[in-house]
């Protein structure tokens, strides 16, 4: 795990400083896994980590951040994947790309978990369409309540890295 942590710091996927998050909240660090996903060797390591953790024969993730992660992991595991889209106002209006059977178990992958709301949205979309979702995986858990929210909704969160494990981290 130390190798991946070092890679995330090296490529600038984890930065320390003064940042304003999407929520408007200030933070002393910023995590952007999309930055890491553009580096083939780092993406390969992330996919390898997920491949050792995933227990279902199909995975899913929310566009945009999770897409390179689910594609790389699906290729490594030779399993199909589902992309969960954000709101659609054109085309077929479908929120899901990919197929699965009602009652099929699907694991969800996310890049970064903070509050857990993004993962929960993906999980709820999948469940509303008949999937069984019990587990979610992320590259980095910011440890800001996301795991608790997911647990309350029947989802076990399995992070590759918890932010408190990262060298240089301080709240």
From Swiss-Prot:
Assembly and binders: Homodimer.
The family this protein is said to belong to: Belongs to the purine/pyrimidine phosphoribosyltransferase family. PyrE subfamily.
Record: residues binding 5-phospho-alpha-D-ribose 1-diphosphate: 85-86, 88, 90, 110-118
Protein name: Orotate phosphoribosyltransferase
Class of the enzyme per the UniProt entry, highest EC level: transferase
S-S bonds: none
Keywords: Glycosyltransferase, Magnesium, Pyrimidine biosynthesis, Transferase
GO BP field: 'de novo' UMP biosynthetic process; pyrimidine nucleobase biosynthetic process
Catalytic activity field: orotidine 5'-phosphate + diphosphate = orotate + 5-phospho-alpha-D-ribose 1-diphosphate
Enzyme Commission number(s): 2.4.2.10
Species per Swiss-Prot/TrEMBL record: Thermoplasma acidophilum (strain ATCC 25905 / DSM 1728 / JCM 9062 / NBRC 15155 / AMRC-C165)
NCBIfam families documented for this protein: pyrE
HAMAP family: PyrE
Record-linked PANTHER family: OROTATE PHOSPHORIBOSYLTRANSFERASE, URIDINE 5'-MONOPHOSPHATE SYNTHASE
Cofactor(s) for this UniProt protein: Mg(2+)
Pathway stated in the Swiss-Prot or TrEMBL entry: Pyrimidine metabolism; UMP biosynthesis via de novo pathway; UMP from orotate: step 1/2
Classification lineage: Archaea, Methanobacteriati, Thermoplasmatota, Thermoplasmata, Thermoplasmatales
Recorded GO MF terms: magnesium ion binding; orotate phosphoribosyltransferase activity
Residues binding orotate: 114, 142
Pfam assignment, any one: Pribosyltran
Function statement: Catalyzes the transfer of a ribosyl phosphate group from 5-phosphoribose 1-diphosphate to orotate, leading to the formation of orotidine monophosphate (OMP).
Keyword Glycosyltransferase carried by entry: yes
């Amino acid at each position: 795990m130390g190798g991946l942590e070092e890679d995330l710091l090296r490529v600038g996927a984890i930065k320390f400083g003064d940042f304003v998050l999407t929520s408007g909240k200030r933070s002393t660090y910023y995590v952007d896994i999309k930055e890491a996903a553009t580096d083939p060797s780092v993406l390969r390591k992330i996919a390898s980590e997920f491949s050792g953790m995933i227990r279902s024969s199909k995975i899913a993730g929310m566009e945009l951040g999770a897409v390179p992660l689910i594609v790389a992991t699906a290729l490594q595991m030779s399993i199909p994947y589902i992309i969960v889209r954000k709101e659609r106002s054109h085309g077929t209006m479908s929120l899901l790309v990919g197929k699965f059977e009602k009652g099929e178990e699907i694991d969800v992958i996310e890049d970064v978990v903070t509050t857990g709301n993004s993962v929960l949205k993906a999980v709820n979309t999948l469940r509303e369409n008949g999937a069984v979702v019990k587990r979610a995986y992320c590259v980095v858990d910011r440890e800001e309540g996301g795991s608790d929210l997911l647990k309350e909704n029947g989802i076990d969160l399995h992070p590759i890295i918890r932010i408190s494990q990262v060298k240089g981290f301080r709240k």
